[in-house]
């Protein structure tokens, strides 16, 4: 959309008000016929701009504005269930947006439109691939392709995250185990994380589905979900990355699926590192955040 109103002034501000609003907060005010957008960062100004355009589209009176905004949630992320072969698990609207086979040589203009659309509603992160992850997403060839997407998304304040297979050290690194307490395994992850941040300095982190529906995980080695998540969190911590560890865990050995997440995670309360988030589904199974 194009702005059809009067003069607009965008300003970066380091005053107390904008420090309090954080790096994504902003103010919009009108003064003497001019609209002033102020924020502590360029990302805040981006969101302020979209807010102003949204008001215009709604037909609001934009001549007397006095707005302060601060996001209620720091991480506002999309989880794509896209596979590397272009299929989408539970996908009902065609194939994947990501043309991995083309990203070696070209970058589709659709990726910029994707970033613009998501930034306009405040999305600031995207997990590119299915939680039932192929280890290949962490190969050097694929990371180069991920870098190209990250470069397109960055101006719109969108960080890239990856779903990872917990057995990647075995599949890609040739190790004999993926035990999170094994020193070689931890070293492999630290080196892989270092490689990722060398390509994508603002990489968001990992999403992990472990020990659920046949996916590998720390429980295969007698370790807890916390021990598995914390090993990855330690590798990501120096770079500001996070781990999103899914709580959707169940196996066919117990008929009562609804209690399994509680039984596995409640004893681990307080044992996860501060850059680990336990991610639940907004559904009737994981701790019943929403009843059917």
Predicted regions and their residues:
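Short acidic low-complexity segments
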Residues: 2-13
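Catalytic-core regions of glycoside hydrolase
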Residues: 148, 174-292
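Charged, often glycine-rich, active-site loop that binds/positions anionic groups
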Residues: 15-22, 258-262
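Feature activates predominantly on carbohydrate-active enzymes
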Residues: 17-207, 237
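Structural motif
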Residues: 12-17, 38-42, 82, 247-249, ...
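Domain-scale selection of a single, long terminal region
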Residues: 1, 22, 26, 37, ...
């Amino acid at each position: 959309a194009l702005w059809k109103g009067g003069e607009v002034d965008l300003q970066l501000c380091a005053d107390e008000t904008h420090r309090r609003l954080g790096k994504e907060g902003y103010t919009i005010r009108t003064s003497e016929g001019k609209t002033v957008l102020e924020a502590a960062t360029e990302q805040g100004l981006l969101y302020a701009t979209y807010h102003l355009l949204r008001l215009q589209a709604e037909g609001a009176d934009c001549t007397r504005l006095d707005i302060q905004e601060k996001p209620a949630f720091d991480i506002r992320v999309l989880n794509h269930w896209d596979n590397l072969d272009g299929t989408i698990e539970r996908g009902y609207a065609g194939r994947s947006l990501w043309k991995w086979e083309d990203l070696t040589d070209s970058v589709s203009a659709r990726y910029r439109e994707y970033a613009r659309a998501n930034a306009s509603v405040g999305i600031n992160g995207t997990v590119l691939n299915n939680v039932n992850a192929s280890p290949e997403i962490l190969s050097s060839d694929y990371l180069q392709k991920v870098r190209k997407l990250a470069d397109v998304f960055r101006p719109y304040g969108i960080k890239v995250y990856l779903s990872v297979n917990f057995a990647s050290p075995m599949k890609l690194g040739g190790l004999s185990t993926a035990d999170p307490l094994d020193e070689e395994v931890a070293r492999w992850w630290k080196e892989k994380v270092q490689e990722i941040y060398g390509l994508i300095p603002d990489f968001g982190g990992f999403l992990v589905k472990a020990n659920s529906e046949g996916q590998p995980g720390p429980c295969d080695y007698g370790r807890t979900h916390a021990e598995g998540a914390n090993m990855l969190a330690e590798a990501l911590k120096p770079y500001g990355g996070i781990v999103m560890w899914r709580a959707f865990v169940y196996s066919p050995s117990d008929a009562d699926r609804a209690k399994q997440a509680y039984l596995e995670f409640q004893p681990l309360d307080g044992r996860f590192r501060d850059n680990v988030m336990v991610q639940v589904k907004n559904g009737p199974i994981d701790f019943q955040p929403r009843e059917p």
